[in-house]
């Protein structure tokens, strides 16, 4: 790939403009020492009733951690141990790791649906 082509691609991305995400996770990446706690935030602006937290480990498909069918209610998924959630309102569904362990190293996904 020539330098000129690479510059054009970068320039095109700069002019792409903002995109409405609908659902946002934060932080986007995190390195955490064993034994430390942290909260992954998930926010959606689509007024969906249901929200979900999944994890994907190397070589495996998505596995459900916790879910919420409506604000004020939560349920456990396939791999809930070591995690807690809350759902005080329709828009937010934070996932907390109380005391991180190496087996929780994963890619985490938040989702929502009607």
Swiss-Prot record:
- What InterPro entries does the annotation carry? Ig-like_dom, Ig-like_dom_sf, Ig-like_fold, Ig_V-set, TCR_beta_variable
Tell me one GO biological process term: cell surface receptor signaling pathway
SMART domains assigned to the protein according to its UniProt record, in alphabetical order: IGv (SM00406)
Where's it found, cell-wise?
Cell membrane
What are the coiled-coil residue ranges?
none
Can you supply one Gene Ontology CC term for this chain's record? plasma membrane
Q: List the disulfide bonds.
A: 42-110
One Pfam family it belongs to: V-set
Q: Where is the signal peptide?
A: 1-21
Q: Locate the Ig-like domain: which residues?
A: 22-114
Keywords per UniProt: Adaptive immunity, Cell membrane, Disulfide bond, Immunity, Immunoglobulin domain, Membrane, Receptor, Signal, T cell receptor
Q: Which domain of life does the UniProt lineage start with?
A: Eukaryota
Checking PANTHER family in the record gives:
T CELL RECEPTOR BETA VARIABLE 6-2-RELATED, T-CELL RECEPTOR BETA CHAIN
State what this protein does: V region of the variable domain of T cell receptor (TR) beta chain that participates in the antigen recognition. Alpha-beta T cell receptors are antigen specific receptors which are essential to the immune response and are present on the cell surface of T lymphocytes. Recognize peptide-major histocompatibility (MH) (pMH) complexes that are displayed by antigen presenting cells (APC), a prerequisite for efficient T cell adaptive immunity against pathogens.
State how it assembles. Alpha-beta TR is a heterodimer composed of an alpha and beta chain; disulfide-linked. The alpha-beta TR is associated with the transmembrane signaling CD3 coreceptor proteins to form the TR-CD3 (TcR or TCR). The assembly of alpha-beta TR heterodimers with CD3 occurs in the endoplasmic reticulum where a single alpha-beta TR heterodimer associates with one CD3D-CD3E heterodimer, one CD3G-CD3E heterodimer and one CD247 homodimer forming a stable octameric structure. CD3D-CD3E and CD3G-CD3E heterodimers preferentially associate with TR alpha and TR beta chains, respectively.
Query: What is the name of this protein?
Result: T cell receptor beta variable 6-4
Q: What is the lineage of its organism?
A: Eukaryota, Metazoa, Chordata, Craniata, Vertebrata
């Amino acid at each position: 790939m020539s330098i000129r082509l690479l510059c054009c691609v970068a320039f095109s991305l700069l002019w792409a403009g903002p995109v409405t995400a609908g659902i946002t996770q934060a932080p986007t990446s995190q390195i955490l020492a064993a034994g430390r706690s942290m909260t992954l935030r998930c926010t959606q602006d689509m007024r969906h009733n249901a929200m979900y937290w999944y994890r994907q480990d190397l070589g495996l498909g998505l596995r459900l951690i916790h879910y919420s069918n409506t604000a004020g209610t939560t349920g456990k998924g396939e791999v809930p141990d070591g995690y807690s959630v809350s759902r005080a309102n329709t828009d937010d569904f934070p996932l907390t790791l109380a005391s991180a362990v190496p087996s929780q190293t994963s890619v985490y996904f938040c989702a929502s649906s009607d």
